[in-house]
Design a protein with these regions (language model features):
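Non-catalytic, topology-defining segments of multipass membrane proteins
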Residues: 1-4, 25, 29-124, 130
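Acidic (Asp/Glu-rich) catalytic motifs at the cytosolic membrane interface
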Residues: 2-22, 41-54, 140-144, 166-167
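Alpha-helical membrane-inserting segments
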Residues: 5, 9, 110, 131, ...
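Short, function-defining helix-loop hinge/capping sites that tune catalysis or transport
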Residues: 18-19, 58, 149
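Select transmembrane alpha-helical segments in multipass membrane proteins
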Residues: 23-30, 161-165
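Alpha-helical transmembrane anchor segments
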Residues: 124-167
């Protein structure tokens, strides 16, 4: 379910500014972290990523053009990194502060329902998002110091196995 919502959110960011987006998609990013930016900020960062595509102005550059261990760490900490970099570079206006406070309270309310279950959910969510972000940004878009789009390593046998497993 999370992956479907994230894909819908990604497509929406390319088409719709903040006022046109419904609450359901806005809440999609809620449970990633208590320090999470809102849709408006995510959209600005995402469009900047496409504009600079791995270059110096790309907010995702630390996931793409760094050594694999650092890229993995950055991928695991995307929400927090984005939050602190946004606040450092642009400040915390009243709208963002209110949105962050509401999202943090909702995050903590969900944690309070059942902390152990939430911790298991949250760790698996963060690991799956972080690892998939690492594969997408670093493995597919960085090769031997170059930035671009590259095929996954592994050769024909891995592709056959993938087709057999996933169709």
């Amino acid at each position: 379910l999370y992956a479907r919502l994230a894909l819908a959110l990604h497509e929406t960011m390319h088409r719709h500014p903040s006022p046109e987006v419904g609450l359901w998609l806005r809440l999609c990013i809620l449970l990633e972290s208590p320090l999470v930016l809102g849709y408006r900020e995510h959209r600005a960062l995402h469009l900047r990523h496409h504009r600079f595509n791995g270059g110096p102005g790309d907010p995702d550059r630390p996931l793409i053009a760094t050594a694999p261990p650092r890229a993995l760490l950055c991928a695991l900490l995307v929400p927090e990194r984005a939050f602190f970099e946004w606040v450092r570079d642009r400040g915390l206006d009243a709208r963002l502060a209110l949105g962050c406070a509401v999202r943090a309270v909702l995050f903590l309310a969900v944690v309070a329902i059942d902390p152990a279950v939430f911790l298991a959910y949250w760790l698996s969510l963060r690991l799956s998002i972080g690892l998939s972000g690492f594969v997408f940004h670093h493995v597919l878009h960085a090769r031997e110091g170059r930035v671009g789009s590259f095929a996954l390593p592994g050769g024909p046998r891995v592709l056959r196995l993938g087709r057999w497993l996933f169709g």
